[in-house]
Amino acid sequence: MGCGTSKVLPEPPKDVQLDLVKKVEPFSGTKSDVYKHFITEVDSVGPVKAGFPAASQYAHPCPGPPTAGHTEPPSEPPRRARVAKYRAKFDPRVTAKYDIKALIGRGSFSRVVRVEHRATRQPYAIKMIETKYREGREVCESELRVLRRVRHANIIQLVEVFETQERVYMVMELATGGELFDRIIAKGSFTERDATRVLQMVLDGVRYLHALGITHRDLKPENLLYYHPGTDSKIIITDFGLASARKKGDDCLMKTTCGTPEYIAPEVLVRKPYTNSVDMWALGVIAYILLSGTMPFEDDNRTRLYRQILRGKYSYSGEPWPSVSNLAKDFIDRLLTVDPGARMTALQALRHPWVVSMAASSSMKNLHRSISQNLLKRASSRCQSTKSAQSTRSSRSTRSNKSRRVRERELRELNLRYQQQYNG
């Protein structure tokens, strides 16, 4: 999930106390083919939730019929065998401290497992990244550079890091509350006041990041997780694989083209230098989805999608928009503006009347029915177009995969047309 450009090496820890293993000698034993060729999937993965039904899509594939001459050991149940298999891929220093429980996420160069601290029995997530691959190395460097600096209630916390010659193991908080839109579907009621509570937590985390010179660059619903299943759970921001970290107060412009198409800001599409205002555009898209269950910009054709974004044209037609307050629409309008200089900052967004009125006059109309129907309708449509049963998940309507990442060639062609039109 890297941007395709090299990044600087991680900074030393500042705000977080880390137990960092600088170098671990290779295993003296013989490595099996499974160990050497561990990564086989085709997508990257960020910090992943656990304990939520949808996590089953990341489970280890069910074994097929046994091949000739091969049978499962009768003394070891399949689940125990799978856990043992993944445990064997971890450095002994990790398994000495953490008990490997289950695989909860996988990617082309990473795995995320649920673990338990042997001494305290506290659950954590460990993200294991194969740094021998360039893309994995870039994502690892980016995440470590950010997570070593941050300490905020609404941002995933790094606990400690173990490093070997070919892998990095990042021990992080375990978010068990599920994804944002999965919770909305399950809740049965969702009002503007609920929306402002969610956005206030996310905005406070983004404000903190921007104050440190950190731009997330890939804010989207699946990177916003509930910390626990309770109704009072906080939201945490995850997945900093595309993040840019600069020195505090440094206003230097960024140029790397990266992000997820539906959430990417216009200035990135035309390959102009950009600032952390790209995160605010993405938050405008998230706010729009949060209040309607639909996307402001959407088209299966990338070129048409990008043209929609460049024009900044979206609609408030259809349900539930007639029931949404003008104040909420004004909040979105001030974020989804093509001119990055005119967009609200995170601090300004926190002070917007719609967010400030969260506990007082925000609309209490229940938008749940329309939002749920829109999310499920879009998920069903996506399922038919991809012929994938997994697409029926409610939050699948806002998900992206590697094939949906921004492609340099498409942006070069789009930028050429844009320049020709502008100069003509």
Curated annotation (Swiss-Prot):
Ranges of Low complexity composition bias in the record: 385-398
Source organism of this protein record: Homo sapiens (Human)
Key word Transcription present: no
One Gene Ontology MF term: protein serine kinase activity
Gene Ontology process terms (BP): determination of left/right symmetry; heart development
Superkingdom classification of source: Eukaryota
Protein name: Serine/threonine-protein kinase H1
Self-association state and partner proteins as the record states: Homodimer.
Location (main, coarse): Golgi
Domain Protein kinase as annotated: residue spans: 98-355
EC identifiers of the protein: 2.7.11.1
Expression sites (tissue/organ): Expressed in all tissues and cell lines tested with the highest level of abundance in testis.
Pfam families the record matches: Pkinase
Gene Ontology cellular component list: centrosome; cilium; cytoplasm; cytosol; endoplasmic reticulum membrane; Golgi apparatus; nuclear speck; plasma membrane
